[in-house]
Amino acid sequence: MKAYAFGFPKIGEKREFKKALEDFWKGKITEEQFEEEMNKLRMYMVENYRKNVDVIPSNELSYYDFVLDTAVMVGAVPERFGEYRGLSTYFDMARGGKALEMTKFFNTNYHYLVPEIETEEFYLLENKPLEDYLFFKSKGIETAPWVIGPFTFLYLSKRNGEWIRRPNQMEKLLESLVSVYKEVFEKLVENGCKEILVNEPAFVCDLEKAHWDLILNVYRELSEFPLTVFTYYDSVSDYEACVSLPVKRLHFDFVSNEENLKNLEKHGFPEDKKLVAGVINGRQPWKVDLRKVASLVEKLGASAISNSCPLFHLPVTLELENNLPGGLKEKLAFAKEKLEELKMLKDFLEGKTFDLPNVSFEDFAVDLQAVERVRNLPEDSFRREKEYTERDRIQRERLNLPLFPTTTIGSFPQTPEVRKMRSKYRKGEISKEEYEAFIKEQIKKAIELQEEIGLDVLVHGEFERTDMVEFFAEKLNGIATTQNGWVLSYGSRCYRPPIIYGTVTRPEPMTLKEITYAQSLTEKPVKGMLTGPVTIMSWSYYREDIPEREIAYQIALAINEEVKDLEEAGIKIVQIDEPAFREKAPIKKSKWPEYFEWAINAFNLAANARPETQIHAHMCYSDFNEIIEYIHQLEFDVISIEASRSKGEIISAFENFKGWIKQIGVGVWDIHSPAVPSINEMREIVERVLRVLPKELIWINPDCGLKTRNWDEVIPSLRNMVALAKEMREKFES
């Protein structure tokens, strides 16, 4: 029995990766010093592997993103970056003004840079797999280089702004791409490499027979090399085609669902290759029941075990956590502990005897009363009392807003002063009273500024919040937050996913104090600001023994209690942010109806407000076409969307959907850019939307929250936005 592992987090126990990378960007350290820091992290990762598994991956420490590394390897550097000059060009592609687009890696919370393919000829530009292999070999460590496979690389790429996913688009490009991979693999083998770990997660996507024909051709071309092909995040789309590939070993994910297992039982597994069973969950931080997993491995007849998917979706180690709720720590395993589980599982399968940990969750942190409430929800819990047209009439009378009402999405700049005061409060250097007085002062300034600029619907600014999910996690029962449970989101940006470990309930109001204070300062409506249940769940870890639907409904009920408290306090508009509504959808579209049924119900349960309360939803993605029918079923009154990058073209989704009657907040300002948008640029977007929607349905707002921007960018941009709204009103009212 062999133990494999892959995708160990590169960030270091104390985010050493982030510090070194940002210091290098700021010019505080030289390239040589940066490389030294990276080498320390490389050794740390490999030492953890060496203690626990048999096959040690190399080429796993990317300086920004492993898909970007692959693009550089095969010479896919867009012309606008000029001649490739090492790290300076590499980081220009990642984060300069001309940077590549960034999007989610499959349905995970990791973001990758989308390669832009401008040519049909690839060539070997930089052989990082070989460099890394030789780095470890020089230290006497034999490794197996980890690479993104050619099919997945192309599947994740775009040409002229469109995905390269149709078989006829891929065929010629794959031929050229494979020649580069051949060259890379030849050089590795020439230098003594005995195994190459090729990652092909795209094999689990909705692929046609023509795709599998291409994949078979690719791997016939590469059949002379010692390849282990890894698939993960779901079951492979065509099991029989996949197991027929001429490779030495195949890794399947047996954690995400049971389809790979069912296919293996039905069709068997070929004798000419070995099965690597992905049985230790790489996406959730729970300890496994090793006896149960061992019996699955035996049932599979696997000759090797591994994690189900990359471990970089987990924090580095549990060792630094000292403040978790009682009984929780012993039920958890982060990346380092998952490696230890693999070692323990291998030892157990080889007949070694020892006490296995008890990981029973049966009655852990369960609130039976709350569970029963969720299980017995009446059907009308998921529908508002009146239909939208009736609600709209009531709300227009109550709010009396002008045409083209203006608002922002919620957060205002978190200045160094705000962050410093929060840090002081958390360290106990200032009292709760001092901190709350400071927050009140920030809210007062924000309300005064919005009044002066002339916005129609105001926000309190969210100065008391670090993160839109962590803020609520800290206030809800059944959710724990960590001290050092950092996970990489993209580049050097890390976040700490909360852990949903028990029944989720709301012990007391979470946002009432700040929102009602803000409302007391103005006659204009101030929005209540809440994060939706699907996003709280999607950006957290959650129990595997409780159905996802049930967890989402528990959170939704807690959010709905907050909505009701805000209504009671006289708040007329409540916004529920659901950026994860689309991204949590399964990879395979055949599973969408089941997911969207409970995701829609969860939002509607949270949003079940009085008819006179205007519910806003905020979703910041750029492609609504695929999910417009599901969005239409959500019980909001206004939805705000990102429209600036597409110059308003996103509205085509609503144009093609017959019967759209709800209001839309059009994002006219790309908040990811420091540039102040001109009135002309904003007007162009609104005019595009007016070709589709009547003027009565249009709101004007930025794309997203303004937390990461500076006040000197925010104020002129908001002034331009309000000036545009006034201009549009005059045009239509004259």
Curated annotation (Swiss-Prot):
InterPro entries: Cbl-indep_Met_Synth_N, Cobalamin-indep_Met_synthase, Met_Synth_C/arc, UROD/MetE-like_sf. Pfam families: Meth_synt_1, Meth_synt_2. L-methionine binds at I409, G410, S411, E462, D577. Binds 1 zinc ion per subunit. Keywords: Amino-acid biosynthesis, Metal-binding, Methionine biosynthesis, Methyltransferase, Repeat, Transferase, Zinc. The active site is at H672. Signal peptide: none annotated. Zn(2+) binds at H618, C620, E642, C704. 5-methyltetrahydropteroyltri-L-glutamate binds at R15, E16, F17, K18, K104, R493, C494, W539, E583. The keyword Glycoprotein does not apply. Its EC number is 2.1.1.14. It is an enzyme of class 2 (transferase). GO terms for molecular function: 5-methyltetrahydropteroyltriglutamate-homocysteine S-methyltransferase activity; zinc ion binding. It catalyses: 5-methyltetrahydropteroyltri-L-glutamate + L-homocysteine = tetrahydropteroyltri-L-glutamate + L-methionine. The keyword S-adenosyl-L-methionine does not apply. Belongs to the vitamin-B12 independent methionine synthase family. Catalyzes the transfer of a methyl group from 5-methyltetrahydrofolate to homocysteine resulting in methionine formation. This is 5-methyltetrahydropteroyltriglutamate--homocysteine methyltransferase. It comes from Thermotoga maritima (strain ATCC 43589 / DSM 3109 / JCM 10099 / NBRC 100826 / MSB8). The lineage of its organism: Bacteria, Thermotogati, Thermotogota, Thermotogae, Thermotogales.
